């Protein structure tokens, strides 16, 4: 593995290896830590605002012995129109790796292609691979190693956003059952479904059907960054998909609710449900550190060869 650009690019074995390493690095935190990034500088190139992604990467890089360098696109020449390939070729001669949080998937892929250094997708409009790895890590902590393979996982809300797409690719690679519950116009198009080609991913417009028997129920904001102008015109379609007590009555016994945060209480999730599952949701956020440390360490080891 030379880059992490999407869950799609990974094999099932690579995902399992990253999860195992994430568990190990979390257990070792504060003692017997590896320093695979010692002497290295990693850039965090962000076009979008961030709390969890920025902090978790800065902490993870530092704990692995490296130096994080935060670069907002508004502070570098990318923000003034310099081509990505030029920025990539410059930084590739100066730093050891980069995590990029931006809009278009093609931007991350172009940077990786031209920089020649390990590149991590820290979120695009198409995928959010680091969050999915953190979520899978959290599932294993709650239910046991590899427990996802025997469970149904549900995602309700916008069925065609970066989180739902990354969940679909994880289901494809790992073989668990995934139900996507979303309004008709917010389910993936047929072209994507044909490309995915995965019988264990179920699409439905019925939120109850999606959640029925699910051990893990995921949701996300209805308006992703950059979609704020759509406002009420988009939100009105999603209220039947709100994660609330009534919907969760159809989930499996012992279920958990996941949210990648930030959450808008009273919209995609009710206040009482979020607070009830806060220990899970905020563990999920913490595990961004450990999942990303696993990615960083794996990329550094591959680079050394």
From Swiss-Prot:
**Protein residues bound to L-ornithine:** 162, 220, 224-225
Note the coiled coil stretches, chain numbering.
none
Q: Which UniProt keywords apply?
A: Arginine metabolism, Cytoplasm, Transferase
Q: SUPFAM superfamilies this protein is in?
A: Aspartate/ornithine carbamoyltransferase
- For the protein in the UniProt heading, the enzyme class is transferase
One Pfam family of this protein, by short name?
OTCace_N
GO MF annotations in UniProt: amino acid binding; ornithine carbamoyltransferase activity
Question: Which catalytic reaction applies to this protein?
Answer: carbamoyl phosphate + L-ornithine = L-citrulline + phosphate + H(+)
PROSITE patterns (alphabetical): CARBAMOYLTRANSFERASE
Q: Does the keyword Cytoplasm apply?
A: yes
Specify whether Ligase is a keyword of the entry: no
Gene Ontology terms: biological process: arginine biosynthetic process via ornithine; arginine catabolic process to ornithine; citrulline biosynthetic process
Cellular component (GO) terms are: cytoplasm
Q: Where does carbamoyl phosphate bind?
A: 50-53, 77, 101, 128-131, 260-261, 288
Which family does the record claim for this protein?
A: Belongs to the aspartate/ornithine carbamoyltransferase superfamily. OTCase family.
Q: What does this protein do?
A: Reversibly catalyzes the transfer of the carbamoyl group from carbamoyl phosphate (CP) to the N(epsilon) atom of ornithine (ORN) to produce L-citrulline.
Q: What is this protein called?
A: Ornithine carbamoyltransferase
Record the organism.
Akkermansia muciniphila (strain ATCC BAA-835 / DSM 22959 / JCM 33894 / BCRC 81048 / CCUG 64013 / CIP 107961 / Muc)
What does UniProt list as this organism's lineage? Bacteria, Pseudomonadati, Verrucomicrobiota, Verrucomicrobiia, Verrucomicrobiales
């Amino acid at each position: 593995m030379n880059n992490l650009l999407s869950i799609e690019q990974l094999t099932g074995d690579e995902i399992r290896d990253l999860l195992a390493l994430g568990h190990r690095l979390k257990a070792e935190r504060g003692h017997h830590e590896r320093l695979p990034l010692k002497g290295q500088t990693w850039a965090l190139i962000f076009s979008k605002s961030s709390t969890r992604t920025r902090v978790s990467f800065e902490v993870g890089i530092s704990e692995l012995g490296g130096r994080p360098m935060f670069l907002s696109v508004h502070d570098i020449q990318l923000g003034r129109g310099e081509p990505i390939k030029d920025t990539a070729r410059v930084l590739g001669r100066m730093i050891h790796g980069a995590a990029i949080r931006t809009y278009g998937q093609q931007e991350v892929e172009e940077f990786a292609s031209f920089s020649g250094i390990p590149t991590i997708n820290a979120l695009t409009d198409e995928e959010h691979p680091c969050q999915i790895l953190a979520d899978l890590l959290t599932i294993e902590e709650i239910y046991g190693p590899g427990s996802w393979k025997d469970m149904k996982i549900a995602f309700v809300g916008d069925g065609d956003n970066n989180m739902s797409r990354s969940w679909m690719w994880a289901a494809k690679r790992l073989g668990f059952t995934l139900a996507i519950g979303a309004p008709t116009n917010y389910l993936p198009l047929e072209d994507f479904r044909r490309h995915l080609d995965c019988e264990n991913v179920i699409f439905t417009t019925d939120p109850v059907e999606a959640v029925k028997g699910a051990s893990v129920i995921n949701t996300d904001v209805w308006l992703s960054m950059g979609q704020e102008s759509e406002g009420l015109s988009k939100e009105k379609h999603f209220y039947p998909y709100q994660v609330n007590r009534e919907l969760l009555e159809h989930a499996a016994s012992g279920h958990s609710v996941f949210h990648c945060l930030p959450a808008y209480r009273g919209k995609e999730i009710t206040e009482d449900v979020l607070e009830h599952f806060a220990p899970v949701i905020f563990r999920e956020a913490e595990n961004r550190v450990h999942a990303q440390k696993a990615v960083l360490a794996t990329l550094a080891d591959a680079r050394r060869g």
